[in-house]
């Protein structure tokens, strides 16, 4: 296969389809989503058979249990896909929405209209559920999509793509509006991320090595985040009960997510009251504690152990595991400085009863999501009321934080007049 020619053809067809899908009615888009949902339920056995072949190959290659679990399309996973499609169909359609209309002295009205981005390339690892999630959000937001999943999920993604195409056709929409790259060749990714004439934005969903490669090689703009080095700072004016609840949930609710706390900062004045019960709780749950000298002194005095001495690298590490770095700081100044120096601008939280300090933390911490008296785990499109998300961005341009339907659109200016001319 000539990968360059193949991907160029995919891009050309996506660009053509994007013009049709951009003007599709809400009813047609919702009909397509419902048709895909019904098709998944109808063809569940065929989907599971294709997926079983992917799973068997993954096991033969020695992939671990966590990888295989993400790859597997269980009955529960298929049900979640169907529910997700129907849930996206219930979301308000942002396309064509007018805002900020104002009359100008000249007599014209100036405002903004929300429009699709165009063609979105989604690059992700071997998680077939992303095929449906991404296709649904891009379709509802009026965008064409090129999906390039991990090679281990190729049969699963191909089977899902067939059903998506059927759903689009049933609703009278172009099947090329959602295309799955049908090759495992890595050169396809290299071509996709440089096709500026056909692709408007890339959304990568994957590990750090994938994101780093795309940062270095992509010519198409990206909506992305590299790391989730999230912090909770417990202020010396915090409620101890709230601190324990927030810090427990932020770390132990799920270890492998990008919005899990990786570093705990505690004000010196409240450290014994907070770290003594927290340290015991974390050790009971099997969390390894990597601590600075001050935190070690407090925890050892409380009989908490074993402990590991933290290095500078620990403050820069996204563990995605039951490991937590702990540092005692003098106060909010030091906490904000540490977060802005070592954090990844993803999600950070303060626990405090002091309103002025809370507002200062919100203003000065340079992250996509900043929270007061709440777990970092809330940094999620569903929890934020977006309905669904295609990912989380810690960049500052275009979309920042959880990226839902509006994050897959842009605003253009519109002018309404009555024959006015500029003087």
Curated annotation (Swiss-Prot):
Pfam families: Aldedh
Signal peptide interval: none
Transmembrane domains' residue ranges: none
Reactions performed catalytically: L-glutamate 5-semialdehyde + phosphate + NADP(+) = L-glutamyl 5-phosphate + NADPH + H(+)
CDD domains to which the protein is assigned, alphabetical: ALDH_F18-19_ProA-GPR
InterPro entries: Ald_DH/histidinol_DH, Ald_DH_C, Ald_DH_N, Aldehyde_DH_dom, G-glutamylP_reductase_CS, Glu-5-SA_DH, GPR_dom
EC number: 1.2.1.41
Gene Ontology biological process terms, A to Z: L-proline biosynthetic process
A Gene Ontology molecular function term of the record: glutamate-5-semialdehyde dehydrogenase activity
Subcellular location: Cytoplasm
Reported function: Catalyzes the NADPH-dependent reduction of L-glutamate 5-phosphate into L-glutamate 5-semialdehyde and phosphate. The product spontaneously undergoes cyclization to form 1-pyrroline-5-carboxylate.
Protein name (database record): Gamma-glutamyl phosphate reductase
Annotated source species: Burkholderia mallei (strain ATCC 23344)
């Amino acid at each position: 296969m000539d990968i360059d020619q193949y991907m160029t053809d995919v891009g050309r067809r996506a660009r053509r389809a994007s013009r049709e899908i951009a003007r599709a009615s809400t009813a047609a888009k919702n009909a397509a989503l419902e048709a895909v949902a019904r098709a998944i339920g109808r063809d569940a056995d065929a989907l599971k058979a294709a997926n079983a072949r992917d799973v068997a190959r993954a096991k033969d290659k020695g992939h671990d249990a966590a990888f295989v679990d993400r790859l597997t399309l269980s009955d529960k996973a298929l049900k979640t896909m169907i529910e997700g499609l129907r849930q996206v169909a219930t979301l308000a359609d942002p396309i064509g929405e007018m805002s900020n209309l104002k009359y100008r002295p000249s007599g014209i009205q100036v405002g903004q209209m929300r429009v699709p981005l165009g063609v979105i390339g989604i690059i992700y690892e071997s998680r077939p559920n992303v095929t449906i999630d991404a296709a649904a959000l891009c379709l509802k937001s009026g965008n064409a999509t090129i999906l390039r999943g991990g090679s281990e999920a190729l049969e699963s993604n191909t089977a899902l793509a067939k059903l998506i195409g059927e759903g689009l056709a049933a609703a009278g929409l172009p099947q090329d509006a959602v295309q799955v790259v049908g090759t495992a060749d890595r050169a396809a990714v290299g071509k996709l991320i440089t096709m500026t004439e056909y692709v408007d934005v890339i959304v990568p969903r994957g590990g750090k090595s994938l994101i780093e490669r795309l940062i270095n090689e992509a010519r198409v703009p990206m909506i992305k985040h590299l790391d989730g080095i999230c912090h909770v700072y417990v202020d010396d004016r915090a409620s101890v009960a709230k601190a324990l609840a927030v810090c427990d949930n932020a770390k132990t609710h799920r270890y492998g997510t990008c919005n899990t706390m990786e570093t705990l900062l505690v004000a010196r004045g409240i450290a014994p009251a907070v770290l003594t019960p927290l340290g015991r709780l974390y050790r009971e749950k099997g969390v390894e504690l990597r601590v600075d000298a001050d935190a070690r002194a407090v925890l050892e005095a409380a009989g908490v152990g074993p402990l590991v001495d933290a290095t500078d690298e620990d403050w820069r590490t996204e563990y995605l595991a039951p490991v937590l770095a702990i540092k005692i700081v003098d106060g909010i100044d030091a906490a904000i400085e540490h977060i802005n120096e070592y954090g990844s601008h993803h999600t950070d939280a303060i626990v405090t009863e002091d309103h002025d300090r809370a507002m200062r933390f919100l203003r000065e911490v340079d992250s996509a999501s900043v929270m007061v008296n709440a777990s970092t785990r809330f940094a999620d499109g569903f929890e934020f009321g977006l309905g669904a998300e295609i990912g989380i961005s810690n960049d500052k341009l275009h979309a920042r934080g959880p990226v839902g339907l509006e994050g897959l659109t842009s605003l253009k200016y519109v002018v309404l007049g009555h024959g006015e001319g500029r003087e």
